[in-house]
């Protein structure tokens, strides 16, 4: 029998009674949220709305995004990244398992000096991909051109946020490059590796 989403006690400031809320709502109230699945439109919209709401609520207190994701849809991930740059509070990113593909792009989008990896975390970068299997020739060409533009944008962001030269980032993005937490720190994808 599944246990569902655990409930935890919560008391709002100034209220006498404790109410039981699901654990995610409790964590959201502490400005902690999670990307623990493949990136798609739904999770992207949820994270974006949370960041905007919490930044309106208090624009000086940091937000914390914990990441354990295999990646997913590029445009949805870029929307999360753009929102992180747009909101006023710093967004601290914490890799706690795997940040692969577009999830590593989100990880690198955290506030500089506030991008963290757990000691056994893994980070993987590569170029964006698409499937052209059933496309007409004209569609194939248009999609390939769009993919090249997206790759250039992602490369530019990695260069800006890691401090690595463009040739290093371009070379790394030609294939799947997996990094340990310390390798990701040396590469500039994270700023700090937590101690064991």
UniProtKB/Swiss-Prot annotation:
Q: Does the keyword Plastid apply?
A: yes
Q: What is its EC number?
A: 3.4.21.92
CDD domains per the record?
S14_ClpP_2 (cd07017)
Q: What is its main location?
A: plastid
Check the record and name the Pfam families matching this protein: CLP_protease
| Family per similarity comment | Belongs to the peptidase S14 family.
Instruction: Kindly provide the name given to this protein in its UniProt entry.
Output: ATP-dependent Clp protease proteolytic subunit
Query: What taxonomic lineage is listed for the species of origin?
Result: Eukaryota, Viridiplantae, Streptophyta, Embryophyta, Tracheophyta
């Amino acid at each position: 029998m599944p246990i569902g989403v655990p409930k935890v006690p919560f008391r709002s400031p100034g209220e006498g009674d404790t109410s039981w809320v699901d654990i995610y709502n409790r964590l959201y109230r502490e400005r902690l949220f999670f990307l623990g699945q493949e990136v798609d439109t739904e999770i992207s919209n949820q994270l974006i709305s949370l960041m905007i709401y919490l930044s309106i609520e208090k624009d000086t207190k940091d937000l914390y995004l914990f990441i354990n994701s295999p990646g997913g849809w590029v445009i949805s991930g870029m929307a999360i990244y753009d929102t992180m740059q747009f909101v006023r509070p710093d967004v601290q990113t914490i890799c706690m398992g795997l940040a692969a593909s577009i999830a590593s792009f989100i990880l690198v989008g955290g506030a500089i000096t506030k991008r963290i990896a757990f000691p056994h975390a893994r980070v993987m970068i590569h170029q964006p991909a698409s499937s052209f299997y059933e496309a007409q020739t004209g569609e194939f060409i248009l999609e390939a051109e769009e993919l090249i533009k997206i790759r250039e944008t992602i490369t530019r962001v990695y260069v800006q946020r890691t401090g690595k030269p463009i040739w290093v980032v371009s070379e790394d993005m030609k294939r799947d490059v997996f990094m340990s937490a310390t390798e990701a720190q040396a590469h500039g994808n994270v700023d700090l590796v937590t101690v064991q």
